[in-house]
Design a protein with these regions (language model features):
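Alpha-helical segment of the N-proximal tetratricopeptide repeat
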Residues: 15-47, 51, 57-60, 64, ...
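Helix-start (N-cap) detector for alpha-helical repeat units in TPR-like alpha-solenoids
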Residues: 19, 52-53, 86-87, 120-121, ...
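Canonical positions in the second alpha-helix
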Residues: 44-45, 77-78, 111-112, 145-146, ...
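Short coil turns that delineate tetratricopeptide repeat
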Residues: 49-50, 83, 117, 151, ...
Length: 288
């Protein structure tokens, strides 16, 4: 190749070189967290050449950006071209779940399970879709299979607890949340789910301790504050409820529900003026 050819290349080489440069720059940008630039490079590369590997990189960028609706059509095309690629199809199913496309997610998982009935991730994602569709019994079956195959699949155990909660099966919920808290006592979501289960089976003192532990981990957990406050009130600890709501309002002055709850406690304590003021503030923050 002559000197000028080595610089400028033939038109074909130039086109190929541009594609490679854009793709490689896009991948490097993705790895560095420069996601908008990565998207720009990879889209430009695909305008030059239809390439599955580049589509996969672009889909990955969109997933990192939480742009699931943009990733989905790319994954659909890739899975149609590579129907036997298990990891790709699992990613497709997961993305469908992010977009709450439950029926399609269930269908994709059914195809995966037909190929491998012991694929725990497909069982989990199928159960996620079944929960979304209200098919709780099938979801429980799949999640039980999943946790039997992989006892350390904590997301599956948590999802089963959530499905059982939707069914009102609180004793069964408690069994799962106890196991989760044992595996990771510092996990806020596990602690919160366990506290809710304890409160629903009538173990109020333990539930109070558990909600207090949640707030030790995260004092900004609004739902935990309201649940704990209701427990304080139901066990005649109105002074603690009042203190809890006041501290929450100090931390989060826009916490309308805390104003409303504190107003209710003040009313029970015969502080009608204070109750009216809190209710007014609650309505200002969140008009009903």
């Amino acid at each position: 190749m002559g000197f000028f050819s080595s610089i400028f290349g033939t038109p074909q080489t130039s086109e190929e070189g541009k594609f490679d440069t854009l793709r490689d720059d896009g991948v490097r940008a993705m790895q560095m967290g420069e996601l908008p630039y990565a998207e720009k490079c990879l889209k430009a590369a695909l305008e030059l050449r239809d390439d599955d590997k580049t589509k996969a990189f672009l889909a990955e960028v969109y997933l990192h950006m939480n742009q699931y609706d943009a990733a989905l059509p790319l994954l659909e095309v890739l899975c149609a071209a590579h129907p036997d690629d298990k990891e790709l199809n699992l990613l497709w199913a997961q993305t469908l779940g992010k977009l709450e496309k439950w029926e399609k997610q269930r269908d994709v998982c059914a195809a995966l399970l037909k190929t491998d009935a012991t694929e725990a991730r497909a069982l989990y994602l199928s159960a996620q879709a079944e929960k979304g569709l209200g098919d709780y019994l099938t979801a429980i079956v799949h999640l039980t299979q999943c946790t039997t195959l992989r006892p350390d699949f904590h997301s599956a155990r948590l999802l089963r607890a959530q499905v059982l909660e939707a069914m009102g099966q609180w004793n069964e919920v408690l069994a799962d949340t106890e196991a989760l808290v044992e595996t990771n006592p510092e996990n806020e979501e596990y602690q919160f789910s366990h506290a809710r289960a304890l409160s629903h089976v009538g173990r109020e003192d333990e539930a109070i301790q558990q909600f207090e532990a949640v707030l030790q981990l995260n004092p900004f957990n609004r739902e935990a504050i309201l649940c704990l406050g209701r427990l304080y009130e139901s066990t005649s600890r109105r002074d603690k409820a009042l203190k809890l709501y006041t501290e929450a309002i100090d931390l989060m002055p826009d916490f309308a529900e805390a104003y409303k709850a504190r107003g209710g406690v003040k009313h029970q304590l015969k502080d009608d003026a204070g109750a009216a003021e809190d209710l007014k503030r609650s309505l200002e923050l969140a008009p009903e």
